[in-house]
Amino acid sequence: MLSKNLETAINKQINAEFWSAYLYLSMSTYASNRGLPGVANWFEVQFKEEMDHAIKFMNYMISKGNKVNLFPIDAVPTTWDSVLNLFEENLKHEQVVTSLIYDLFALARSEKDFATESLVQWFVNEQVEEEENALNNIDALKLIGDNGFGLYSLDKELAARVYVPIATTNSGSNA
């Protein structure tokens, strides 16, 4: 069983993951409403990944005999100034999530909970990828501009992104 401190922290992280999913669904809808199905697809994949993250944490809590508390999800933004701003906000959000994950890792380490530390290490690695993806999209938009043919081309590229489910149980590897 996890300590009360870790139980509370992981329950907060579960809420943050669901909020992230809701944010990305909102971003996907924003892109769809602007005729950008590729950008919408990219954020829909993000939405699904965040749902997986929440469920991975939930299943871990259950496997440890702890109680999962599903808190209300606060409202998310629904409008952005531009596609570039959309991805800039995506990066800012991922940086916040990285900070939350680091705090959770530090707590697990301070409590010498090596199993939780191992689980959270997977999320540390995931956040490196999440921030890199956001930065790559921002760099592309700054290079090509977020309108016209450049945006059309990027939208086509982002349409090719495919959702690959992660293992949401914690037996075996954390992949």
Locations of the language-model features?
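Iron-associated oxidoreductase/ferritin-like identity signal
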Residues: 1-175
